[in-house]
């Protein structure tokens, strides 16, 4: 009976450890995505002023009027 109780408690601990490690992995992935979004370059939406550091999101700039298409 004691052996069965020890095996049951060990199985419960392993299951709990797997569940909590999955939660941490998901959290790390979210943190990584947030970091990547901050590091990505900005782009100017259509109708906005186009200039070199922040190119147009559409990749098309009307240079005479200097706005993104």
From Swiss-Prot:
The GO cellular component terms are: extracellular region
For this UniProt record, give its keywords in alphabetical order, as a comma-separated list: Cleavage on pair of basic residues, Disulfide bond, Knottin, Secreted, Signal, Toxin
User: Does the record bear Hydrolase in its keywords?
Assistant: no
Please list the disulfide bridges.
Answer: 43-57, 50-61, 56-68
Tissue localization of expression is:
Expressed by the venom duct.
Q: Tell me the GO molecular function terms.
A: ion channel inhibitor activity; toxin activity
Location in the cell reads: Secreted
Signal peptide extent = 1-17
The record ties this protein, via InterPro entries, to:
Conotoxin
**Coarse class of the protein's main subcellular location:** secreted
From the UniProt entry, list the residue stretches annotated as the region Disordered.
Answer: 20-41
Keyword Signal (UniProt) = yes
Which residues form the propeptide in this entry?
Answer: 18-40
Family, according to the entry, reads as follows: Belongs to the conotoxin O1 superfamily.
How does the entry describe the domains? The presence of a 'disulfide through disulfide knot' structurally defines this protein as a knottin.
**What name appears for this protein in its UniProt entry?**
Conotoxin AbVIF
